[in-house]
Amino acid sequence: TGVQTCALPISVDATVGIAPKRARGFVNAILRKVASADVEWPSDAVRLSYPDWLVTQLVNDHGETDALAMLERMNVEPSVHERVDGYVQDPASQWVCEMVDAQPTELILDSCAAPGGKATLMAAHGAIVVAADRSTKRTRLVAANAQRTGATSVSAVVAEGTASPFRNKAFDRVLVDAPCSGLGVLRRRADARWRIDAEAIERLTKLQTKLLAHGAQAVKPGGRLVYSVCTVTRAETCEIAATIGEGFESIDVLAMNDVWRPWGSGGGYVLPQDQDSDGMAVFAWQRVG
């Protein structure tokens, strides 16, 4: 990689510098020979520095070519994208808000809102946003970001997404940006690859299913429901979307923005190597009943 290419000469020079003067030529020759030799890695997981299970998971879900390209890209430092209001937000998160398509004066529920990036962006379109999250600490973060960006129509509310205090069919649009394995944002959280495990995905899918079901109850007839996660495992995307109950018709997200690859019934996903963005998946429905 570029990082390795840069680091090797530095490492060689540093080592030569501490060697006895009479041995420096010998040390330099040996180290540079080793540095230029082809390395036979025991596996892609070792080569790219990821847990075995994670590499296997993504290869199973996306095929070897896309999975390895994704893993390689997430070892590269991400670009910084700043909105006009000064908030730094990855393009994929902004594309999710495009799927919500919040309109002026509409009442929007962002049911897993912290840190508030999506809520403030939807408010910038003139919508009234109820930004809910499960703890005071998290809603304070939302409120602080709303104040910093001038998003005066955002109301931060402590509310558990699986036991919603809101009336059924109360909102024009609902965004369920659910907690997930975060495998699409590992370029921002490099250590997270070693903290998550396969069992965590199974636990998260149970939570995601409940969050989507409760979010669906809050949508008005004719309103829109959007489910998004910053991961691209099938278990947390297509399989969760398939649990949506009767009364909802799928909206083709690819027709709204062609950055997405097709995923399941009407959904879409983007991999980090596609658009220099985080990995993200999104599904959208209209309530017809």
Task: List each model region and its residues.
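S-adenosylmethionine
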Residues: 4-289
